[in-house]
Structure formats: structure tokens, C-alpha cells
């Protein structure tokens, strides 16, 4: 008899694992829809799936928040059934030779800021902002960024009164050291400003290919964390952002100007990057670097190793990155966005245009389902520049992630630090994914 959970979901092959347990591909036996099933032993020392499921319930309905389909106990396991998602940004970064173009970084940044704004609006901090925890969707949501893994999330204010948690020091480092804010390294209680600063480090990681504090050698984890902290403190914002648009330095200066209980001006941060996007003459066409790279590989007839199958998100290694400073050649736009008034120019200065069947040959499995709506990129509201709807005739072929992508990542040089038992953190003491 085939294994089932919740009397509704058929358990399939394993697609990932983490400190919490394992992730399996599953199928809804009623709809035949594929899902991701997270299993955690009920005997684990620090169970976290129950805690995470409660946070998912709070966040349900938000754009870029995976849908939780079922949570319960089956035999010896706590079980969480969720949407099946595509590759993580870490996997896609590796697929693209460990560097993203400015255009891709800006398209991602807009959505990632929106994700943090939504989580914060629900009175929670994420506290483990890293590329592994941002995944692309599948099907008509393939251009949508999702944020996962709430095992280290913490409520920072009362939902009714909005009273903020108190400022405290001498806190243990919680999160992934590579992307932790300066204040987190200094032992200061985390707040909204720290999630935002961590996102800034991700953006620079994508642009530069690596961060200055990667690959440091140390005898143990504490020494490693101390060295990362020292290097991060000694690296000025200008040094970190050298060679890249000044908007990135402005982003960090703003983050570090925030007081502990300040609400970040998310609209200002999005406006910084949207104005840069416009000034560069980019088009919000959702042609990310991985789309370009797969297209080039299909044309060269020499496909490269590919990222993992889509899942709810398996943690990939965070090895020291090697930057690739070469710009990728232009590729024709997948579509034309009628709402966007700027055009991209080809090498001769002309507006580029190409038939869709030229960009998407039959051998290139980039799209399967239909639909995605779009918004003008200069709109500074909190809505997405696109909603992933199914009624946009101008975008008939939505990216479906990258089918069958696989990446083999080795163990990273940094892992997420977990809360220590200090009597004041009520969240789980273990880290998933």
C-alpha cells in the first residue's frame, strides 16, 4: 500500500533534507497536484514544524508566501504539506556561474523587499535572510519570488497594540553569519532593520559573486563568527559597494541609520532601485539571467549541469564564491511589456524585437502554462510589478522555473546559527533547511 499523509497526500521520492528532517515530493490524490511534504521526527530534540506551521497560518494569502495545505502528525512524524516550488536563488546563482547581472538583481530586489514588508506587517521578523530561503515559483508563478523557512522567525511586536519588543544586548547570534547585520554580530536584539540589512548583503553577493568575509579560516564556529564580524565591521559601505551603482551604498547607509524600533521605509528602498532600473534602460520583462543562460546553452548545444528539482526549498551549500566579471551577451526579450515606456536597445542602438518562436524553440523547455500580469515599474506602491495572473495575452508563455535543473552543491563554509537557551527566546532551538 502506498504511503499517505493526511489521508490525502501520496508520499513520493525524497527531494531534500535539512536539520529538521526531510522533504519529499508528494501528490494530492484528489487533484493529482504535486506538493512538497516536510517530515520531522516527533522524537527530535527541538521540534520546529509545529511552530513553523503556526507562522504559515498567520502569513497565508500573502504574495510570495507558500500555501500550507496540511499540518499534522502521522505515526512517528510531524508533517507539513506545502506548495511545491522551484529552485532557490542560491541554486540559480550557481547555475549562472555565481554572478547575476544588475538587471536580474534589481528585478529580484523589488520582490524581496515586498516579501519582508509583508512579513513585518504581520508582526514577525524572519531572522534568516539568505539566498537559500528565496525560491522561484512554478508554472504561471515562475517569475514570482517566494520566501520560506520560518524556523528562526520571531514576533517583534504585539499584534493588537503594536507594542515593540524591548531593546536588549548580549544576544546569541541567530541566523546565517554571512548575511547577518552588524548589530546582530554585536549581540543586539534583532528588529526589522536587521532583516533589511541582511537583504542588502544578498544583493551585493549576487552582484559581486562573493562577500569579503567569505572563506575565512578559523578553528571553530565561534572563532569563525568572530572573524566574519571583524571583517564586516572593518569593511566600509563604500568599499563593499565599490564598482556598483551608488544606490546600493545608499541602501546600506539607510539601513544603518534606522533605530531599533523604526519601521523601515520600504517604498523609499524600492524607489531607489526602481529609479536605477529606469535610468539603466532596463525592461521589466522577467527575463532573468537563468533564462538567458539556458537559452545560450540550448543554442550552443553544450548544456551545463543544472540545478535541483523544484521543491519547497532544500538548503544548498554556501561555498566561497568566485565572481564572473564578464557581462552576458544580450538575449532577445521574452515579451514586450505594453505598460513599460522604455525600450531596450540592441548593440546598434535600435529597439530589439524578435518573434516569440525564435526565442522559445521547441527544444527549449522554458514554459508550460499561461499567464502573467504586469505593472509599470515606476509604480512605488507595495503591489508587485507583476501579479502572476492568467489574463495577460501579451505573456502567453510563463516561465516554469527551469525544468529538471540540478546543481550539486558542496557543504558550505557557514551555516545558520541557532538560538541558545537564554530564557528569553520562545521560538524553537533548531534550524531547518
From Swiss-Prot:
Compartments where located: Cytoplasm
Residues that, per the record, bind ATP: 15-23, 38
Residue positions, PTM Phosphoserine: 390
Residue ranges occupied by any Protein kinase domain in the UniProt entry: 9-278
PROSITE patterns: PROTEIN_KINASE_ATP, PROTEIN_KINASE_DOM, PROTEIN_KINASE_ST
Enzyme class: transferase
Family matches, as InterPro entries: CK1_Ser-Thr_kinase (IPR050235), Kinase-like_dom_sf (IPR011009), Prot_kinase_dom (IPR000719), Protein_kinase_ATP_BS (IPR017441), Ser/Thr_kinase_AS (IPR008271)
Protein's UniProt keywords contain 4Fe-4S: no
Family note: Belongs to the protein kinase superfamily. CK1 Ser/Thr protein kinase family. Casein kinase I subfamily.
Name the UniProt record assigns to this protein: Casein kinase 1-like protein 5
Organism per entry: Arabidopsis thaliana (Mouse-ear cress)
